[in-house]
Design a protein with these regions (language model features):
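Active-site loop of short-chain dehydrogenase/reductase
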Residues: 1-4, 16, 54-55, 87, ...
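Conserved Rossmann-fold NAD(P)-dependent oxidoreductase catalytic core, especially the SDR/UDP-sugar
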Residues: 1-32
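Flexible, glycine-rich beta-alpha linker
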Residues: 13-14, 29-33, 57-74
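Active-site Tyr-X1-5-Lys
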Residues: 15-17, 31-57, 82-83
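Structural element of the ATP-grasp superfamily
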Residues: 45, 78, 177-178
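C-terminal substrate-binding subdomain of Rossmann-fold SDR/epimerase-dehydratase oxidoreductases
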Residues: 82-212
Length: 212
């Protein structure tokens, strides 16, 4: 085995206060069972490295999107909702005045980052793979609706009451990878145009599993 890359998640760090961007070695504070299982799996990887000298690195990646994404995910769900004139529910704070925010990253950028790490890594290290800009989900929905030339019918809902353990804001620092020579190349708005066009041209990928 030359290298084992474990894909973890930004969620292991828990919610990020405004202005905070978690670095790779910051303390974990999982906000839900899914995040806890990912953090536990990271520790299992570390134990295999320490015990069996397995060559392991770990990545934290957040909110990957692209063609063929599952229709339940936010971006394809917005596309299908705008297309059909349906209401989209957007997770927000308790007052329903601020939408949750993320650093969305194109799947092609993630693949590029992985290839970069194959040639540029240090065994036992962790790496954040982060999108170029932070965007809240209402802004993202409005961008998609504008691309489609249709209105966005939406309702803000309290994120925790609708999905316990869901964090309003996730944020990672991409400075480590940047210092190594890697940065995402895809512009969010330009890539969204491509995803919208592809999804509308391949509507089977927007179809819910319950649909015939």
């Amino acid at each position: 085995l030359d290298l084992f890359l474990y894909f973890s998640t930004d969620e292991v760090f828990g919610p990020a206060p405004e202005g905070v961007f978690y670095e790779e070695d910051d303390r974990y504070k999982s906000g839900n069972p899914y995040a806890a299982t990912k953090a536990g799996a990271e520790e299992l990887c570390v134990s295999y490295q320490n015990t069996y000298r397995m060559p392991i690195i770990i990545s934290h990646t957040m909110n990957i999107f692209g063609n063929r994404q599952h229709p339940e995910k936010f971006i394809p769900l917005v596309i299908s909702s705008v297309r059909d004139g349906k209401k989209i529910f957007i997770h927000s704070n308790e007052e329903c005045s601020k939408a949750g925010s993320r650093h969305y990253i194109d799947a092609k950028d993630v693949a590029d980052a992985v290839l970069f790490l194959f040639d540029n890594h240090k065994i036992g290290e962790k790496y954040n793979i982060v999108g170029r800009e932070e965007t809240d989900n209402l802004e993202l929905g409005l961008i998609i609706a504008d691309i489609m030339g249709k209105p966005l019918n939406y309702e803000m809902i309290d994120f925790h009451s609708s999905r316990p353990g869901h964090d309003l804001r996730y944020a990672l620092s991409g400075e480590k990878m940047k210092a190594m020579g890697w940065e995402p190349r895809k512009d969010l708005k330009d890539r969204l145009k491509g995803v919208v066009k592809w999804s509308l041209g391949n509507p089977v990928w927007l179809r819910d599993e319950d649909e015939n």
